[in-house]
Amino acid sequence: MIILGIDPALGSLGWAVVAKETAQLKYLASGIIRTNSKDAIHHRLAFINSTLEKVILEYQPNMAAIEETFVNTNSVTSLKLGYARGAIMSLIGRYNLDMREFKPNTVKKTVTGYGHAEKDQMLHMIKLLLSGTALITNSDEADAVAIAYTCLVTKNY
């Protein structure tokens, strides 16, 4: 089972690929997709879509796991995040991948044991739980690993 974990965002999207081979979890890859805030939104969404598509084609995941969105007090920010999620979900659908969504607190609790863990705690635990993640320093990337990890350990596939 290969899971593509996604921490959705318009400016800095985290992605990660984690596999379950027999009883072992294996980190395969992760990264950040950054868009320029000066670019038109449709160009930013197209860039996210095409870059994430390359990840899907390279790693051939069986499923995508994505963090659920919380509604921000800033409606413009929430709307832009919704655009990014829509572009991502459209791509997931185009490749006929199953998809699971996880609340941020569920991911934090699964990884750290505490549903309100801070970013640095998440990053620390990901490095302990999955070998190969030692060089990850970006919290968006670590969150994507954590989302894929949560999908696999909760057997939500």
UniProtKB/Swiss-Prot annotation:
<comment type="function">
    <text>The RuvA-RuvB-RuvC complex processes Holliday junction (HJ) DNA during genetic recombination and DNA repair. Endonuclease that resolves HJ intermediates. Cleaves cruciform DNA by making single-stranded nicks across the HJ at symmetrical positions within the homologous arms, yielding a 5'-phosphate and a 3'-hydroxyl group; requires a central core of homology in the junction. The consensus cleavage sequence is 5'-(A/T)TT(C/G)-3'. Cleavage occurs on the 3'-side of the TT dinucleotide at the point of strand exchange.</text>
</comment>
<comment type="subunit">
    <text>Homodimer which binds Holliday junction (HJ) DNA. The HJ becomes 2-fold symmetrical on binding to RuvC with unstacked arms; it has a different conformation from HJ DNA in complex with RuvA. In the full resolvosome a probable DNA-RuvA(4)-RuvB(12)-RuvC(2) complex forms which resolves the HJ.</text>
</comment>
<dbReference type="GO" id="GO:0006310">
    <property type="term" value="P:DNA recombination"/>
</dbReference>
<dbReference type="GO" id="GO:0005737">
    <property type="term" value="C:cytoplasm"/>
</dbReference>
<dbReference type="GO" id="GO:0006281">
    <property type="term" value="P:DNA repair"/>
</dbReference>
<feature type="active site">
    <location>
        <position position="140"/>
    </location>
</feature>
<keyword id="KW-0479">Metal-binding</keyword>
<keyword id="KW-0255">Endonuclease</keyword>
<dbReference type="InterPro" id="IPR012337">
    <property type="entry name" value="RNaseH-like_sf"/>
</dbReference>
<keyword id="KW-0233">DNA recombination</keyword>
<dbReference type="InterPro" id="IPR036397">
    <property type="entry name" value="RNaseH_sf"/>
</dbReference>
<feature type="active site">
    <location>
        <position position="7"/>
    </location>
</feature>
<dbReference type="GO" id="GO:0048476">
    <property type="term" value="C:Holliday junction resolvase complex"/>
</dbReference>
<dbReference type="InterPro" id="IPR020563">
    <property type="entry name" value="X-over_junc_endoDNase_Mg_BS"/>
</dbReference>
<keyword id="KW-0234">DNA repair</keyword>
<keyword id="KW-0378">Hydrolase</keyword>
<feature type="binding site">
    <location>
        <position position="7"/>
    </location>
    <ligand>
        <name>Mg(2+) 1</name>
    </ligand>
</feature>
<keyword id="KW-0540">Nuclease</keyword>
<feature type="binding site">
    <location>
        <position position="67"/>
    </location>
    <ligand>
        <name>Mg(2+) 2</name>
    </ligand>
</feature>
<dbReference type="GO" id="GO:0008821">
    <property type="term" value="F:crossover junction DNA endonuclease activity"/>
</dbReference>
<protein>
    <recommendedName>
        <fullName>Crossover junction endodeoxyribonuclease RuvC</fullName>
        <ecNumber>3.1.21.10</ecNumber>
    </recommendedName>
</protein>
<keyword id="KW-0227">DNA damage</keyword>
<dbReference type="GO" id="GO:0003677">
    <property type="term" value="F:DNA binding"/>
</dbReference>
<keyword id="KW-0460">Magnesium</keyword>
<feature type="binding site">
    <location>
        <position position="140"/>
    </location>
    <ligand>
        <name>Mg(2+) 1</name>
    </ligand>
</feature>
<dbReference type="InterPro" id="IPR002176">
    <property type="entry name" value="X-over_junc_endoDNase_RuvC"/>
</dbReference>
<dbReference type="Pfam" id="PF02075">
    <property type="entry name" value="RuvC"/>
</dbReference>
<dbReference type="GO" id="GO:0000287">
    <property type="term" value="F:magnesium ion binding"/>
</dbReference>
<keyword id="KW-0238">DNA-binding</keyword>
<comment type="similarity">
    <text>Belongs to the RuvC family.</text>
</comment>
<feature type="active site">
    <location>
        <position position="67"/>
    </location>
</feature>
<keyword id="KW-0963">Cytoplasm</keyword>
